Amino acid sequence: MKKKLFVSELIKHFDLEVLNHDFPEIEDREILTPSIKRLGLELSGHFIYDAISGVIVGWGTNESKFFEKIGSEKAKSSIEEIFSRKIPMLVLSKGFDKNYYSTIIEIANKHKTPVIFYKASLSEINTILGIYLLQYFAKKVQVHGTLVSVFGMGILIVGDSGLGKSEAALELVQKGHVLISDDAVLVSHYGNKYFGKAPYITKNLIEVRGLGLIDILSVHGLKSVLPECEINFVVELKDYEQNKSNFDRLGNKVLKYQIGEWKIPKIEIPIRQGRSVASLIEASANMFLSKLNGHDVLAMIQERSLNDE
């Protein structure tokens, strides 16, 4: 089912100032897309289908200058045409000319549309509201796994049941790292990044065999939990005996973990009795950071071998 967001929810979340709040017949319309449209051709009367229906419209300094240029009558006609398209709300930035407020509010009331004033530039409004809208509308996939933040890197730990994902997460928390979610992770993708969070019912909880449910927030404090974080890579725990001929010994393979149509960088860790999984996950985080900084161990070895000849 498609997620819905109504204007009233956005107004409440950001405590937005509604300029025509005293007009009782304003409709609580549904926002259909995660974007704020500035309008270009539309202001001059050229519309492509109903491209702005269900889209938040934002106006700033450039729009008020355009209205000034075309004159009050044409400006009024243009504003009327915009509101007739059933936009959910209009956001005016601090740079928009207040001389047009009365005209806009009069037309907005006629079409039962809320007009919002946000004390920021339109680019700032696009960033603040836009990020929230992207997160709200982003597709979410539930994954069986555990999400932790290690040295600031979001690591999704996956693998068969019984390999010690939760135990490793608990040990990482005891070492000072951060839990985001255990057992189930809601993964979303927006921009070019992946993010994970806990389902509400399991938030801040770890289930460890023999101990039961542990409330990490109560036991280890606020520093040990986060509501959400970016997923930088996946660590897949694999039974050594069942997969010993398939492991990448040199770490030179490019591995990916697939979640739906998404592919996230992956590191495989073989699990054997007596190995500290938490320490290996810490090492994988350090290796990942090292690679991001351009350090390539295999290239270094090749260079050494050439210099040794």
Swiss-Prot record:
CDD domains per the UniProt record, alphabetical: HprK_C (cd01918)
Family annotation (InterPro entries): HPr(Ser)_kin/Pase, Hpr_kin/Pase_C, Hpr_kin/Pase_Hpr_N, P-loop_NTPase, Ser_kin/Pase_Hpr-like_N_sf
GO MF term list: ATP binding; magnesium ion binding; phosphorelay sensor kinase activity; protein serine/threonine kinase activity; protein serine/threonine/tyrosine kinase activity
Similarity comment: Belongs to the HPrK/P family.
Xref: NCBIfam families: hpr-ser
Assembly description: Homohexamer.
Name of the protein: HPr kinase/phosphorylase
Organism name: Mycoplasmopsis pulmonis (strain UAB CTIP)
